[in-house]
Amino acid sequence: MAKVNITRDLINRQIKERGALSFERHYHVTDPFIRRLGLEAELQFLPHAGDRILITGAADSKVHVHDLTVKETIHMFGDHTNRVKRIATAPMWPNTFWSAAEDGLIRQYDLRENSKHSEVLIDLTEYCGQLVEAKCLTVNPQDNNCLAVGASGPFVRLYDIRMIHNHRKSMKQSPSAGVHTFCDRQKPLPDGAAQYYVAGHLPVKLPDYNNRLRVLVATYVTFSPSGTELLVNMGGEQVYLFDLTYKQRPYTFLLPRKCHSSGEVQNGKMSTNGVSNGVSNGLHLHSNGFRLPESRGHVSPQVELPPYLERVKQQANEAFACQQWTQAIQLYSKAVQRAPHNAMLYGNRAAAYMKRKWDGDHYDALRDCLKAISLNPCHLKAHFRLARCLFELKYVAEALECLDDFKGKFPEQAHSSACDALGRDITAALFSKNDGEEKKGAGGGGGPVRLRSTSRKDSISEDEMVLRERSYDYQFRYCGHCNTTTDIKEANFFGSNAQYIVSGSDDGSFFIWEKETTNLVRVLQGDESIVNCLQPHPSYCFLATSGIDPVVRLWNPRPESEDLTGRVVEDMEGASQANQRRMNADPLEVMLLNMGYRITGLSSGGAGASDDEDSSEGQVQCRPS
């Protein structure tokens, strides 16, 4: 690890396309002539300009364009009315760039025009109200017409720049462009120009998060080098990877119509001639219950594990028995990657997720249960865990229907203590929900995604609600870091084949995960306070990190025998658990912790979460098969 000293208090970064490194805070990469008022948020070099033209955005809401060879500011744009958070450029358009600011606008700049004003490309306030803030943006490296935008809330937006421009051009050229009736409404964006992505469990959790003053905001978005994946660091939550090629809707509850229970078809094992309806995962949950699939599909027999994977599964089972939930999850994930058609592995991993109970774990457990059922519709434990997951995710009516379905499929379990306990929980929740709706009156209805505000400042338009309901779900989730203190925290792809994911954290560390297994492989201390920025070198195995400390650290591989001067965090699981507690802590406690105060339960070890949800499962145990 090398260290570059910087004399200011916060550093942002830019790694140029050719691979040279440059860092700045008030542009220490250049002379003081381009120093700015306020905290510098972002800078980018204009492509194909010989590293001569530098674009800067700052908290003073201004966007400046500097010529480094003549040491002059050649353009200054003051169109934004709030802090500029990010600048984006595209190699295909060497004279064009974009900015995202906290006024909710995405602006486009064309340096070939003489105008000193920019064009509003996307106005998020037309969709989400006046309080929305744009936080980050990036252009797809393989398709420069594709722009990703992160803003307030859990949704990440992809826009087709070319479609937007063509739509506005056709509107201007239309003979009736200036003639509108009273009922006309001009859409700011054409149909098909926007696509939303969201972690499927987050929309329904928003009311609870808001009540606890927990803010969700996309602090960084970036595409993979191939342009087929989108990585999002979700402030207040986890890091998510979205597959842009094989898209999937948020998982819904869809169950086979019939499944004959017998001693041979339980807990992930079934006879080789078993045939039943399959399970689909392509649609949203609806508040009026779940829909059963109409088509029939062939179910493959249970795949036997090779000896080495059987050993991995046994190690995972042992970790589960010792209540080492994270270790069990990582071992099951390792096995799932090698044997993706084994229902038992998904069912076991779901049980570990349900026991650990970190943010998003019950939704991942739901996904695993559905996958297990799709591979084996007669997987007893997966059916029961599915009902429990739906209950924990606040889909109470669906949980009741799922539990009834479970009792019908497995009548010998219908009166077990586990079923009775879950049934009582669901009944109590339904009564509580009905009482709450009666108190709120007839105007308080609506599904979990269609959340409408009574305030005009943060009202959500009909177009926005449609786009949200058409959103796609994530492929992978990465846990362990904490992202609650700053709104510029990055996550990035790393490795020769982008096989790793890296992210900064509020505890001064940065985390490295395997992309495909989502397993945490290394935690390194990168700052005394917070790691915000992580940028990989485009052609060498270098990683640049920065945060609050007045230094930029450059990381590259070292011999195993070489001392890393205490930078390696040995207790990765303990650090991850502490960060999960920090994310769920009271905001005042987090502020005091960041100021140096010691808060009991936040800065010390221990799993922190009770495991009483499955204590009364009776015959339907949540232990792995």
Q: What spans do the regions from the language model cover?
A:
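Loop/turn segments within WD40 beta-propeller blades
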Residues: 44-51, 88-95, 138-144, 222-227, ...
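Terminal intrinsically disordered, low-complexity extensions flanking WD-repeat/beta-propeller proteins
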Residues: 2-18, 154, 164-230, 235-240, ...
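Conserved beta-strand element within WD40/beta-propeller blades
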Residues: 20, 54-58, 97-101, 147-151, ...
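WD40-repeat beta-propellers
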Residues: 32, 57, 63-68, 87, ...
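Short coil/turn segments within WD40 beta-propeller repeats
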Residues: 41, 59-64, 82, 103-107, ...
